[in-house]
Amino acid sequence: MAFCISYLGAVLPFSLSPRTKFAIFHNTSKHAAYKTCRWNIPRDVGSTPPPSKLHQALCLNAHSTSCMAELPMDYEGKIQGTRHLLHLKDENDPIESLIFVDATQRLGVNHHFQKEIEEILRKSYATMKSPSICKYHTLHDVSLFFCLMRQHGRYVSADVFNNFKGESGRFKEELKRDTRGLVELYEAAQLSFEGERILDEAENFSRQILHGNLASMEDNLRRSVGNKLRYPFHKSIARFTGINYDDDLGGMYEWGKTLRELALMDLQVERSVYQEELLQVSKWWNELGLYKKLTLARNRPFEFYMWSMVILTDYINLSEQRVELTKSVAFIYLIDDIFDVYGTLDELIIFTEAVNKWDYSATDTLPDNMKMCYMTLLDTINGTSQKIYEKYGHNPIDSLKTTWKSLCSAFLVEAKWSASGSLPSANEYLENEKVSSGVYVVLIHLFFLMGLGGTNRGSIELNDTRELMSSIAIIVRIWNDLGCAKNEHQNGKDGSYLDCYKKEHINLTAAQVHEHALELVAIEWKRLNKESFNLNHDSVSSFKQAALNFARMVPLMYSYDNNRRGPVLEEYVKFMLSD
């Protein structure tokens, strides 16, 4: 099932039903016996308007968009006014200054105040990092302090929460009445590392009490708490959660109105930029013309762009990077469709060999319907490498070629599993699907597009990010399979992680397998938290945030109601791209 969003005068289908492995193309797919649902966007052939129509709609909107020249005077004044408020709170009320910093992050305006925020956190860390000092503060204040410090690379021991336990070793009974503190404790627990048992206890305790109290809460509070339980800040996209946080601020602080106004101004600027970028992507896709040659492949430039937009949503100035990254995302889908729809096993072996050669002369060995895709892949990635070289002085083509070779090899493994008619072990599946998910391709391209890895940069190498990328790939893969498992067409032989794990544990129920998958996601988040924390260098902060956004985006992509639609993603898309 797909629903349509009216965007910029055009109707854009944004399909959210799981990408069916059997039902959609059972007569054309060469590999129906084994088909993963990658990134969960079905190829609903025929439902997407031709790119030329989308291009025209975007062009029309470009002329009707409100003039950006009207913004700067008031916009800059609002930024300066907020900066002044930050200074005042830092001097007069250290705890409220932390609440202020948290609010800027949740509303997505913190990028304006990096120096001020850093100074506030530095002072706060110097005075509160000791567990003995924290015992004089409330659960809310300690939890917020813990969150902010870990988010910004300052280590605070989880032992600070021992101050809120009684002699029994359990969290104190009176905390059950502290809704505000419990919500912040739940948020703090999302930043745990492996082995931090007290944070596991904190998450279970706070979640259980808050869920139990929801029914008795006043409507606005119930909605606020419910949203935070479902989408904790650390594992969500700030621009999305900020929709709800705007209501949470209410009239609690005199600076709330100022922050809301600044957030709305930011949103106006961002929408204009995103619309222009989508126009560029549409133009590139239309000129490429591959959708005319590969008529069964997914023809969805808007959806390709969504990944780049959300991953880099915190950095509006990285417009060139978003557009360039979208091209890589598009080719992940195109090559995926070649493996799923167009190629026999022998043809796919030849295609993989051609990618391994990375030479235009290999085009002659390919079937006609693969030649154009192969040549444009080489053109596009070689072009990306050249742009990176011109911008940063180093050429990453060898690394980029390697990641595309790995992706196609992983796709080929899937095709061979399909040809054999059997499921791999759960571990074999996960090791291969980490690669075939496309996560490594996206993040490695992003790594170099953001200027990292050059000989003169010195602070971080690509290999330093491998574990971080691995955890994100597993999170994406498992969430993808959990989303696909809700598809009514599933029959237990579709090649998901759940199917492979169930095959090895035949006594487990579907609910138990589902719970195991969620536990695996939780473990990988803890590893991701640690890897992210360890990559604590100014030069890598933007890449780290973008990589985390990749993992955070997954629940938005794969959150369904009973009708197999995605109300969460629909709301986010409309909010970010509609005037």
Swiss-Prot record:
Q: Which domain of life does the UniProt lineage start with? A: Eukaryota
Q: Which Pfam families match?
A: Terpene_synth (PF01397), Terpene_synth_C (PF03936)
One cellular component GO annotation, for this chain's record? chloroplast stroma
Free-text comment on the cofactor: Binds 3 Mg(2+) or Mn(2+) ions per subunit.
Question: Per UniProt, where does Mg(2+) 1 bind?
Answer: 336, 340
EC number assigned by the record: 4.2.3.105, 4.2.3.106
Keyword line: Chloroplast, Glycoprotein, Lyase, Magnesium, Manganese, Metal-binding, Plastid, Transit peptide
Disulfide-bonded cysteines? none
Compartments (UniProt record): Plastid, Chloroplast stroma
- Where in the body, by tissue, does this protein show up? Accumulates in flowers; mostly expressed in both upper and lower petal lobes, and, to a lower extent, in tube and stamens.
The UniProt GO MF terms for this protein read: (E)-beta-ocimene synthase activity; magnesium ion binding; terpene synthase activity; tricyclene synthase activity
Query: Keyword Kinase on this protein?
Result: no
**Upregulating conditions:** Circadian-regulation with highest levels in early afternoon and lowest levels during the night.
Q: In which residues is Mg(2+) 2 bound?
A: 336, 340
What are the BP-aspect GO terms? Answer: terpenoid biosynthetic process
Which InterPro entries would you find in this protein's record? Answer: Isoprenoid_synthase_dom_sf, Terpene_cyclase-like_1_C, Terpene_synth_N, Terpene_synth_N_sf, Terpene_synthase-like, Terpene_synthase_metal-bd, Terpenoid_cyclase/PrenylTrfase
Domain comment quoted from the record: The Asp-Asp-Xaa-Xaa-Asp/Glu (DDXXD/E) motif is important for the catalytic activity, presumably through binding to Mg(2+).
Q: What does this protein do?
A: Contributes to floral scent emission.
| UniProt name for this protein | Tricyclene synthase 0e23, chloroplastic
